[in-house]
Amino acid sequence: ECLGWMKGCEPKNNKCCSSYVCTYKYPWCRYDL
């Protein structure tokens, strides 16, 4: 199970769905623009 768009996440343990990124600056699942 993965985290969907704009779900809160942990940068060091990225469980976002494919193509989403999780960064320390923006700790939620989103597209890497």
Curated annotation (Swiss-Prot):
Disulfide bond entries: C2-C17, C9-C22, C16-C29
Keywords, in A-Z order: Disulfide bond, Ion channel impairing toxin, Knottin, Neurotoxin, Secreted, Toxin, Voltage-gated sodium channel impairing toxin
Pfam families referenced in this protein's UniProt entry, alphabetically: Toxin_12
GO molecular function, one term: ion channel inhibitor activity
Domain remarks: The presence of a 'disulfide through disulfide knot' structurally defines this protein as a knottin.
Subcellular location: Secreted
Organism placement in taxonomy: Eukaryota, Metazoa, Ecdysozoa, Arthropoda, Chelicerata
Natural source organism: Orphnaecus sp. (strain Maanghit-Cave/Philippines)
Official protein name in the record: Mu-theraphotoxin-Osp1b
Record has Disulfide bond as a keyword: yes
Function: Voltage-gated sodium channel Nav1.7/SCN9A inhibitor.
InterPro entries: Huwentoxin-1 (IPR011696)
Tissue spec. comment: Expressed by the venom gland.
Keyword Secreted included in the entry's annotation: yes
GO CC list: extracellular region
Family: Belongs to the neurotoxin 10 (Hwtx-1) family. 22 (Htx-4) subfamily.
